[in-house]
Amino acid sequence: QVAHIGQRISFGDRIKVAGRPIRVRIAPPPARILAYHKPTGEVVTHDDPQGRPTVFQRLPRLQNGKWMSVGRLDLNTEGLLLFTNSGELANQLMHPRFGVEREYAVRVLGTLDEGARNKLLTGVEIEGQSASFVSISKGEGEGVNQWYRVVITEGRNREVRKLFDAVGLTVNRLIRVRYGAIVL
């Protein structure tokens, strides 16, 4: 289309003068970030072949670009899930080299004794790699179920569940309550 005086251009527009393309540097739109409280039963995928509800079905539409999740939460995990339209921001939040903390409230069947607690803080081997919690604090609990707050700086697949499993405890509820400075 032919431009008119005062017309604005946006990131991604192609501009030609006398039929020849010209280069114009325009900053990309600012990154958007959205905090979402994911319930259990939703999957973190754009399209689920099994027809289960997805987190992306509940997000507001973007005019330009698309939402990408900052990490994932499995089907049976609830809590804070971040979304952004910036791949660079998503990488800075997810990549282990940046050390962004993720905090979880974890209900386990059984009690974490001091020996198991120390193992989880110093590191256990999971699928050939060392994994550990940055911190573990005791929460409330009655009967056979006990709550703990744990912090990790990596987000490997089912890492919190696998760590507790490595010391003989089964996670029966998992809630991400914090991602970096963002709290649920």
Per-segment meaning from a language model:
Residues 1-184:
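Basic, flexible Lys/Arg- and Gly-enriched helix-loop patches that mediate nucleic-acid binding at interfaces
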